[in-house]
Amino acid sequence: MNLDSKIRVIEDFPKKGISFKDITTLLKDKEAFRSMVDQLSDQLIDLDIDIVVGPEARGFLVGAPVAYKIGAGFVPIRKPGKLPGETISYEYELEYGTDSLEIHTDAIQPGQRVAILDDLLATGGTVVATAKLIEELGGEVVSINFLIELGFLNGGEVLKGYSVKSLLKY
């Protein structure tokens, strides 16, 4: 299925000059949603993945169904203060400041094979922070997979050394 035709583009959102890729139109289409999950799962099925990690918030929408389909567990990465148990955090740079992500300290066991799934690769800051948290807990980041990659933002450059795949590239 051509998933590109199911992505709505909204010009000048969230600010002028941005062409926002809205995945809600894909998610509400049962056949497109199933196709997205199937295609992402096909990229991972032979990699013996133990855990799929999805960063807040759209990584949950992409990662959880793929984890189910490939028979892996799912772990959410959250903004600070959203996880109830003991956590570790990783702070990363944004264009205008910093942000931080957290994971439960017992979410990943040493040696577990982990795939990171998210909806969109832009600059790569969120996924680098996610990978660092996984590695700090002893997990092995086997694959990083996206529905969409915005190639002109060069997020793939900061992910050199990782296996990165995207279904759609703009």
Curated annotation (Swiss-Prot):
It holds the Pfam family Pribosyltran. Keywords: Cytoplasm, Glycosyltransferase, Purine salvage, Transferase. One of its GO terms (biological process) is purine ribonucleoside salvage. It is found in: Cytoplasm. It comes from the Bacteria. Homodimer. Catalyzes a salvage reaction resulting in the formation of AMP, that is energically less costly than de novo synthesis. This is Adenine phosphoribosyltransferase. It comes from Alkaliphilus metalliredigens (strain QYMF). The gene is apt.
